[in-house]
């Protein structure tokens, strides 16, 4: 029975080009954007879509085939289940750089603004777990249940 379930999975092979504002890897397959949770820029992953729209899909990483050198072991034991800290697997300084790129791209693409000067990003300690206690609730279609966690 378990083998039947695995054989019915439609896995996509995706090369992650960038990171989006939600911390998901971005790939393009057949002209469609694929947003992959748990994937980092430069990685080659097998992923499974759980949201399918005409112009994009949202997927989760099933297996990392070629790992980024920026991937680190998440410090929270609940990282893979909670959903509250979407970038813990991403090296801290690379996170800052990715967030800066997202910010600049958003200003340019949506705001039609080009910054004359870009200041060095502000960053605190590299590990500020529970610095701000926030409750996050996420419905996971694949599991057909809600996940609740603090970050």
Regions found by a protein language model. Name each.
Residues 1-151:
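Non-catalytic accessory regions of SAM-dependent methyltransferases
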């Amino acid at each position: 029975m378990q083998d039947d379930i695995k054989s019915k999975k439609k896995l996509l092979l995706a090369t992650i080009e960038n990171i989006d504002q939600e911390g998901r890897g971005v790939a393009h397959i057949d002209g469609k954007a694929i947003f992959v949770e748990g994937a980092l820029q430069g990685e080659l992953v097998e992923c499974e879509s759980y949201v399918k729209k005409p112009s994009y899909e949202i997927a989760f990483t099933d297996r990392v085939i070629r790992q980024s050198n920026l991937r680190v072991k998440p410090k929270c034991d609940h990282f893979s289940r909670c959903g509250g800290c979407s970038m813990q697997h991403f090296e801290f300084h690379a996170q800052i750089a990715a967030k800066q790129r997202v910010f600049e791209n958003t200003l340019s693409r949506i705001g039609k603004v080009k910054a004359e000067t870009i200041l060095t990003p502000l960053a605190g300690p590299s590990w500020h777990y529970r610095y701000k206690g926030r409750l996050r609730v996420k419905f996971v279609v694949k599991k057909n249940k809600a996940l609740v966690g603090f970050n």
